[in-house]
Amino acid sequence: MLSNPAPRTRALIDNIQLFQEYHMKYPSHGYRWLNAKIRLDRGIVMSDPYAHKCCKKAGIKSKAKHYKYKKPGAPFKIFPNLLMSEMQIDRPLQCIVSDMTAFWVKGIYYELTLYMDLWNNEILSHSLSSKRGDRMTYISGLEGLLEKKKQHPEYQMILHSDQGSVYASKAFNDLLPMYVTRSMSRAGTPTDNSAMESINGWIKAELFMDFHVTGERPVQEEVDEYIRFFNEERPAYSLSYLTPKQYREKYAA
């Protein structure tokens, strides 16, 4: 390495070290996301090609693996897929997507149910259980969602899910007020809820690779902390690398 490098070379070296620092903290992400996170945290603006150059020189690659979880469902009531209608989502609480994802920590099985606003990818409600097949994660998460919905009583809302047995059950759907319209993915077609499927994969990668969930602390606390990070500090490609909170504050009426 040069003992007295030119300013541009010195800047490149410094930025390579900066990307290495962020990669150590967030190993599940690639250069575009790391660049956006650096911009968000440090106010340092770099082009994506330049960020790619820094990461390539540092040997940085995303270590994330995509997880897939397919659960059987015995549907009781099937609703049409309203997401297939190519509707325009242009406000908060217009369309909420929900799904359950599962993972293991220190030999204990956990199920996490999420309710996400498709407008800005904000997780509005979540519920965690270490009991396999616990229907209350769905119910508790739904109750949290409906509490937030009370802040905007004027809005109609679509709730989209797969055809899992809880989502299709009479007990679940009887909890829904009149202003909530149900929508469901077609059977065996996870791409109908691709946004939620993608988020589930990233969440599990980030929980273990970036947040290092080990069970040394209560898993509920670690999940709550991650959800806050997801909503407030994690830039999203689909939001032009704003966080869900930033997007809501910038565009919500």
Language model regions located:
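C-terminal domain-tail junction helix/linker
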Residues: 173, 177, 202-253
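Short small-residue beta-strand/loop micro-motif enriched in glycine and branched aliphatics
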Residues: 122-126, 182-185, 208-210
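RNase H-like two-metal-ion nuclease catalytic core shared by retroviral integrases
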Residues: 72-74, 161-163, 169-170, 184-204, ...
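An active-site-proximal beta-strand-loop segment
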Residues: 85, 89-124, 128-132
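Cysteine/selenocysteine-centered motifs that mediate thiol-based redox chemistry or coordinate metal-sulfur cofactors
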Residues: 150-168
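Active-site beta-loop-alpha junctions of metal-dependent nucleic acid enzymes
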Residues: 127-152
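Basic, flexible linker segments flanking DNA-binding modules
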Residues: 1-91, 189, 243-251
